[in-house]
């Protein structure tokens, strides 16, 4: 999956979970996402997005938020 598709998917999932996307960057092939969770805390998650399916990304985000 390309970076732009993964980022768009992550933004959509965060929006459904009432979270706010802040920024993203790539380091060594890993997509690092910063966002505000439902309680207003800043969170950071890392995704090896090239090797993940849409379902895997969604599960990682849900586990990270809750």
What are these regions (language model features)?
Residues 17-60:
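Acidic, low-complexity, intrinsically disordered interaction modules
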Residues 1-20, 53, 58, 62-66:
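Negatively charged, low-complexity tracts enriched in Asp/Glu with abundant Ser/Thr
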């Amino acid at each position: 999956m390309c970076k732009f598709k993964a980022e768009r998917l992550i933004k959509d999932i965060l929006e459904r979970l009432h979270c706010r996307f802040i920024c993203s960057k790539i380091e060594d092939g890993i997509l690092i996402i910063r966002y505000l969770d439902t309680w207003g805390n800043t969170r950071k998650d890392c995704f090896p997005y090239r090797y993940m399916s849409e379902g895997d990304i969604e599960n990682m985000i849900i586990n990270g938020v809750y």
